[in-house]
């Protein structure tokens, strides 16, 4: 992989963090984004120790001005944008459909769906004139199945997969690719919050055929491959 410029949202923990480290080990130039400045700066220091150029910029993907500025800063700093990993997400409020509110719906969809849409919009604004680029949206295994008690989160991930498929068709033949990675149960802070108790977490693990959770590093390796020319 030739020193691509990689932008990762939701990069400070879990899959996003592991993906940043995996790209750094490939020699990429990296921009990581999130909403916790101290954590972001520590991650950048770790990436630079690997020997790559890296920057952290704060952005809230729910706000278009933040997303626009994040992409513009990336291009100003590095001159281009080759790969974008849209990983920012929230598990939202669990519970039955009858327990949800307009507010709980909006809180999840603004990050998980609108955030991905705005990110793709501004990433493509740069990539299409370049005639090259690769976008990877991070969904979930719940993007293609149902799950009782998680209707809003599940719905948001179905939306991410639908948007990804549509965007991929829109840019076909331009030199830009849009793909989705849909991890199964992965050992992250989000999963711990989602399952809520050790008993629930153990019950989830029992449904996995290999009887263990995936690691963020395993998912990161998939993202790096899907983003690369080897998957084109």
Residue ranges and their predicted role:
Residues 120, 156, 164:
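Active-site helix of classical SDR
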Residues 12-13, 36:
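Conserved glycine-rich cofactor-binding loop
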Residues 37, 59-70, 102, 217:
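The beta1-alpha1 cofactor-binding region of Rossmann-like NAD(H)/NADP(H)-dependent oxidoreductases
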Residues 125, 169-173, 232:
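Alpha-helical segment proximal to the catalytic Tyr-Lys
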Residues 98-117, 132, 136, 160-161, ...:
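Catalytic Tyr-X3-Lys loop
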Residues 212-232:
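C-terminal substrate-recognition "lid" of short-chain dehydrogenase/reductases
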Residues 140:
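Residue(s) in the substrate-gating loop at a strand-loop-helix junction
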Residues 68, 91-106, 129, 149-152, ...:
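Conserved mid-core segment of classical short-chain dehydrogenase/reductases
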